[in-house]
Amino acid sequence: MLYSSNAILLTVICYELPLSERIRMLLRLEDLFDKIDFFSARDTSFEHHAVLVALFEILDVTSRSDLKSDLLQELDKQRTMLEGLRSNPEVSEKALDHILQDIRAAFRGLLDIPGRIGGHLRDDEWLMSVKQRMSIPGAACEFDLPAYHYWLNLAPEIRREDLKDWITPFTPIRSGINIVLNMLRNSGKNCCYTAVQGLFQQAGSEHQAHLLRLHISSEFPCVPEISANKYALNIRFVPWRSDHKTEVYEEDIPFELTFCSL
């Protein structure tokens, strides 16, 4: 964290730009699982409702992809790569064994998933009736879903046990996602740049990355608009609230950029 001279707390904000649909989906799922962690640890019916909303979104995201096989393939690829580092004297044998153990555990967990991801939820007619009704804006009131209203009025401990039963089968998927994203984020080298008058451009083959991570201080009231391909990277910083799409935040802005690849 950074502190300004007038004692106003400033933070460093990280923006992540996935450069493939596969990584974009993993980041979305990671965000949904984080929301589930946050809300499921609390007691109110509103927070437990938020858990179900996130669970239903996970179902929708995973229904349009072959996530299980993609994760298995990536974990096997990373395991093979890491096994090849055993003869490297600069690599900690203990740390290597630890990550390989995590990869093997996640791999086995994914193999053990029966059928489609989230099948235990899809087979629950009551949950699916709640999900269907929730697809209508504002349609989760007690007169829309009286049985769901009853569940929301049970003791928090009872609701939390139900939530645990619904969340736990996703553990192998989440473990695989965490491993892949952690390895991806740790694969890059941080470089410091300055966007002159809010604009930055760079050409080169290093932009063949899977993920870009940009860090900027919150003292600058702007956000980055990033476009990247294998030929060039363009970053334009715009005011965080603006009525003009072409407006640029015209100051020199220091930022940190990381190109991450698997």
Curated annotation (Swiss-Prot):
It comes from Nitrosomonas europaea (strain ATCC 19718 / CIP 103999 / KCTC 2705 / NBRC 14298). This is Cell division protein ZapD. It comes from the Bacteria. HAMAP family: ZapD (MF_01092). Belongs to the ZapD family. Cell division factor that enhances FtsZ-ring assembly. Directly interacts with FtsZ and promotes bundling of FtsZ protofilaments, with a reduction in FtsZ GTPase activity. It holds the Pfam family ZapD. The keyword Acetylation does not apply. Disulfide bonds: none annotated. Interacts with FtsZ. The lineage of its organism: Bacteria, Pseudomonadati, Pseudomonadota, Betaproteobacteria, Nitrosomonadales. PANTHER family: CELL DIVISION PROTEIN ZAPD (PTHR39455:SF1). The gene is zapD. Coiled coil: none annotated. GO terms for biological process: division septum assembly; FtsZ-dependent cytokinesis.
